[in-house]
């Protein structure tokens, strides 16, 4: 089974406890095929070029053992720096978080801003079905039209993940939509790594023939 984990934090994040190397080596030992590092943009700040180059070094270092991707988790409460679309042009992808929070930037404003990013973009730990109801939108069409993928966050902190595991109606909607779906552990320290949940989510997506980003 092809296994990805595209949401991990390191010491580049204020709440990360491990080095990128430790996260990557744990992924190798856990049988992960693709590991994504996605530290918080508001912690990295002006050191974004340093962060990017560090992850590029890790890509080369571990190239014969695992595929490493350079991502970034971007907070939306409040609206983040307008320079980020240019600053992340070379990144593999970005994850936007907290759009379903009442303090987040306006969703329509977000969609306009998202179009400035040239790298892949996804929604982290977001109940997209609830978000669609909140704005009265066909959220599936919105994500598809704006080339945004969705994340299944296996950290155990978000109920939408557990609902999707057993909700065949929502599974069918996502499958028929063709929207790519990623899997992310949202790891902040290795003691919390949930390998079994990562494998289960990846297996479900493959059984449903739902594409990865």
Regions found by a protein language model. Name each.
Residues 21-38, 56-62:
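Alpha-helical scaffold segments that flank or form the walls of functional sites
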Residues 41-151, 206-211:
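Extended substrate/RNA-proximal surfaces in nucleic-acid metabolism proteins
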Residues 1-6, 10, 20-21, 83-86, ...:
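Charged catalytic cores and adjacent phosphate/nucleic-acid-binding surfaces used
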Residues 15-19:
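Glycine-rich anion/phosphate-binding loops
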Residues 39-40, 73, 155, 186:
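Proline- and acidic/polar-enriched loop/turn elements at helix boundaries
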Residues 2-4, 34, 93, 122:
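Structural motif
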Residues 5, 37-38, 71, 123-125, ...:
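Generic enzyme active-site microenvironment
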């Amino acid at each position: 089974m092809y296994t990805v984990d595209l949401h991990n934090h390191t010491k580049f994040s204020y709440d990360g406890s491990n080095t990128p190397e430790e996260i990557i080596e744990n992924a190798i030992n856990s049988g992960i095929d693709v590991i994504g590092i996605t530290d918080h943009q508001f912690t990295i700040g002006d050191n974004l070029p340093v962060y990017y180059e560090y992850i590029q070094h890790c890509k080369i270092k571990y190239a014969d053992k695992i595929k490493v991707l350079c991502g970034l988790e971007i907070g939306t409460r409040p609206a983040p720096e307008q320079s980020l679309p240019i600053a992340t042009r070379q990144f593999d992808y970005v994850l936007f978080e907290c759009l379903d929070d009442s303090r987040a930037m306006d969703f329509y404003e977000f969609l306009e801003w998202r179009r400035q990013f040239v790298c892949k973009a996804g929604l982290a730990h977001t109940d997209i079905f609830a978000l669609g109801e909140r704005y009265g939108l066909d959220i599936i069409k919105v994500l598809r039209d704006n080339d945004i993928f969705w994340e299944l966050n296996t950290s155990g902190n978000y109920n939408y993940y557990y609902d999707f595991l057993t909700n065949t109606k929502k599974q069918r909607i996502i499958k028929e939509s063709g929207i790519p779906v990623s899997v992310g552990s949202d790891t902040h320290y290795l003691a919390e790594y949930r390998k079994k949940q990562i494998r289960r989510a990846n297996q479900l997506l493959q059984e449903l023939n739902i594409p990865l980003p």
